[in-house]
Amino acid sequence: LPAGLSQWFPALEVLDVSGTGLTEMGMELLSLPCLHTLLAKNNRLGGPGSLPKGLEQAPLARSLRVLNLSGNRFSEVPPALLQLRGLRSLSLGGNRLHGIPPDIQELYSLEFLYLGGNFITAIPPELAKLPSLRYLVLCDNKIQSIPPQLAQLHSLRSLSLHNNLLTYLPREILNLVHLEELSLRGNPLVVRFVRDLTYNPPSLQELAGRTVKTRNVPYAPSDLPDSLVRYLSLASNCPNPKCGGVYFDSCVRQIKFVDFCGKYRLPLMHYLCSPECSSPFSSASQSSTSQSESDSEDEASVAAHRMQKVLLG
């Protein structure tokens, strides 16, 4: 930043230095106590010293509301940014991020978070601890699954997940009753997931545990070792209303399409106690087709009715 900026403009509120080739912001930034919007996208920030030391203690840490650092070279979210507690909008799209730090939860005033166009592979559950978040953009990454905790974002209005590696959504996402926009295009969704489903037969311990639970065999803690008592307490009920069985470690994963907001049919994950609890149309197609084959060949191995109502964006 130019020297003397804070002396010439002590009451500066908006600063746009986008596309100027900046490699570091400089100490001048710390002397702008009224700054609430900083736009520094499409630069070369991201190396050591890109952000001034002491940023989290500067008046800026309290005044800044909007920060856009998209189109730079950050490989991680700078820890100093996680101390800007007044931020309402943070954009770090088009960088080189490989993850989202759990401390993102410290930005509890955040309403808009843009992390699209990076190399993010996972979403930390802590992201769900942003009570004011309304717009979450995670498109064009390498995300394979959505943590069920994300359903705790009760203020969320827009969720962009297109062009990732998602094969299914947790059923908890149905709790996002205020969601108005959901983008999922460009994800594998159920195509390859259904093809690759496998079922591991239950162990003898699991078979015995299922018998005890389904037939209500009485037992007392003194009858069994503590480890088996704990094991029996971990039984999960099969969601098939015609079954009434339970499972422990061995289960069948099934995709079920569920109405969402009255507009879409989304593929959600269900866990069943055995393949017999799956409908004939929901059993996995055990294809040995390689990952390198085209999506059109993948789709041919999945019943058409499974794919025709998947939300694409």
Predicted regions and their residues:
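WD40 beta-propeller repeat fold
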Residues: L1-T23, M27-S31, T37-R44
